[in-house]
Amino acid sequence: MSLGKRFLRQPAVQRLLGRLAAAYLRLVRRTNRFVIQAGNAPPGKADAWLDAHTPLIAGMWHGQHIMMPLMRRPHDRVATIISRNVDGNINTIALEHLGTRVIRASGARGRSRATDMRAKGGAEGLRAMLRALKDGESVAFSADVPKVSRRCDAGILTLARLSGRPIVPAAVVTSRHLRFKSWDRACLGLPFGRGAIVLGDPIYVPRDSAGEAFETLRRFVETEMNRVHARAYALVGRADRAALYREAAPAAVAAPVGDAA
């Protein structure tokens, strides 16, 4: 193990980095002029729209996950799922300082990540998110297939199908930002600019949805997430450049496995 990795494994270092990350995101939120659009709600009615659809399942593209905490209102109860690794430890500390509850779960091994919610954090993670939604807590997480940018994973639809709660495509962007050269073209907002939080119309997944009907819904969610992100960037006067790097979509995924609740 390298010296750098050993350094990052120190609990004190992880706590410091997590707190610094939280402080930075607060700075971004406070120094950008944000506009909020929620579904078909008229201007100034986003709060009422959110209250009417809570608890909900907020889905973002992976490159936007850094900005996710900026969506949360002070009184919102929100949970997210984070892997059990060093990066996850730092992210957990940051998110908890920003008022988001974190579900820690291990990733799946030896099964198709494109077809099973368990790949987002194991059956334990799926059950934990179902419990959160049942208790009135919204959940938010990246919805794309790991390592395949902007390809909607079947998992978010599985969660919606089992819980009966709506998927809400979401995007948080700023006019000034850093774009990383990672597989997901992750984006980190910078202070002192314009910001946009855009939430799409709620999408419900019928309990009996399967096969081609399920796949049609999956593609619709993917399309809506792209539309919401494009709209958010348009509001801040920028192009959604990460869309240019979208990898070719693989063959259509199969319907998810049976209930895991």
Regions found by a protein language model. Name each.
Residues 149-211:
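A cross-family acyltransferase "interaction/gating" segment
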Residues 122-163:
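Catalytic-site beta-strand/loop segments enriched in glycine and acidic/polar residues
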Residues 104-133:
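Extended, non-globular alpha-helical segments
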Residues 202, 209-233, 237:
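C-terminal functional extensions of proteins
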Residues 32-35, 57, 115-121, 146:
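Short, flexible loop segments at the rims of nucleotide/cofactor-binding pockets, characterized by
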Residues 1-72, 76, 99-100, 223, ...:
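Membrane-anchoring hydrophobic helices of lipid-metabolizing enzymes
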Residues 55-115:
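Catalytic core of membrane glycerolipid acyltransferases/transacylases, capturing the structured
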